[in-house]
């Protein structure tokens, strides 16, 4: 498991242009995300796995050839799973990140698991969120079911996609593209009745807004700042 610096811009790219580790393409000089990833892949054993935390930009960036590098890594069938994590997990930064799981020994060849866990976790302070034991267990169980071939897609949370599916999305790996939207439970209220109720509530809000507007004008006028 690795957590390299996010989006590192000064990583000595000019000294490593012909490095043997860049099998999938030379990483851009302004961002080391795919340099870290290719360094780890280069040293990965035939049965090894990598867990890598990266800023979300690595999932979709096309800058400096990153899109091509990502495409080649996907086409090499090294990507086992992508998990989009909630924001505010780190004390040092609030940016959202993702977990990449790479493997040379995938049990589900030609398939990738996508998990959208952005809504998981609990705010433990006003600035920091933590994934709790039930959250971690759900994610772990989902991965285990995927590896065993027993996982069923869950709208809004997880989906298993083929390399062809990913190609159709231009090799962008953002989980939200693949898991869809969670199904909303039907409240049983007929559409016509719901619309009548909502429009009535909206009308009441408009009336209250006009009343407050008149009151504000009145108060401003009383202190010599009238509004026409």
Regions found by a protein language model. Give the residues of each.
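A conserved structural/catalytic subdomain of Rossmann-like adenosyl-cofactor enzymes
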Residues: 1-228
């Amino acid at each position: 498991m690795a957590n390299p610096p996010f989006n590192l811009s000064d990583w000595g790219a000019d000294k490593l242009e012909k490095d043997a580790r860049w099998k999938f393409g030379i990483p851009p000089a302004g961002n080391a995300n795919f340099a870290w990833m290719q360094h780890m892949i280069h040293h990965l054993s035939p049965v090894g796995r990598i867990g890598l935390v990266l800023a979300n930009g690595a999932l979709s960036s096309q800058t400096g050839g990153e899109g091509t590098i990502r495409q080649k890594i996907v086409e090499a069938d090294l990507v086992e799973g992508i998990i989009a994590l909630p924001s505010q997990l780190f004390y040092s930064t609030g940016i959202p990140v993702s977990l990449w799981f790479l493997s040379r020994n995938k049990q589900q060849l030609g398939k990738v698991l996508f998990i959208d866990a952005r809504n998981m976790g609990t705010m433990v302070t006003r600035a920091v969120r933590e994934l709790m034991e039930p959250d971690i267990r759900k994610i772990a169980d989902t991965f285990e079911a995927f590896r065993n071939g027993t996982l069923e897609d869950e709208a809004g949370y997880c989906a298993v996609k083929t390399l062809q599916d990913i190609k159709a999305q231009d090799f962008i790996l953002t989980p939200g593209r693949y898991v869809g939207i969670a199904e909303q439970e039907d409240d049983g209220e007929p559409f016509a009745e719901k619309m009548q109720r909502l429009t009535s509530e909206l009308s009441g809000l408009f009336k209250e807004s006009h009343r407050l507007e008149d009151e504000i004008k009145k108060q401003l006028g009383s202190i010599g700042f009238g509004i026409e």
